[in-house]
Amino acid sequence: MASKKGNRIVIKLKSTESGHTYTTEKNRRNDPNRLELRKYDPIVRRHVLYRETK
């Protein structure tokens, strides 16, 4: 029995300054474009821009 395709998908957020990644979910209907968030990067030890990758 197949399940219905939901609106929430799992995405990876990759740091623009190092290779660190976060994994999170986003709502496909509310955010159809790629996300860009400022989050803490433990490698460079400061807040940097993270971009959504496939």
Curated annotation (Swiss-Prot):
Record GO biological process: translation
GO molecular function, one term: structural constituent of ribosome
Keyword Lyase among record annotations: no
Keywords: Ribonucleoprotein, Ribosomal protein
A GO cellular component annotation in the UniProt record: cytosolic large ribosomal subunit
Superkingdom to which the source organism belongs: Bacteria
HAMAP family on file: Ribosomal_bL33
UniProt cross-references to NCBIfam families, sorted A to Z: PRK00595.1 (NF001860), rpmG_bact (TIGR01023)
Family: Belongs to the bacterial ribosomal protein bL33 family.
Protein name: Large ribosomal subunit protein bL33
